[in-house]
């Protein structure tokens, strides 16, 4: 089961995405559900990296992409917060579709921090 979490920390203005686990819908390397979730994480990571390179983040983002474990944390500048939030929101929409269509493989947790 892949567990996805998206949340914001108002105390420091950071936006978070984590993916943990495996879909286990097919053998390693053939699992399209896992590949879909992974692609969403890589897309957010790249978008956040571009934002950093363009001076839109307060500090370097935390990007950790490992097998079965992805963490992405961005702390955007105040003027760029909406752009960053939209980036994470689009990925959350994708994970929502996966969780809706494959509830036995993907779980989306809504957190309030």
Per-range role (PLM):
Residues 33-37:
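Short, conserved glycine- and acidic-residue-centered signature motifs
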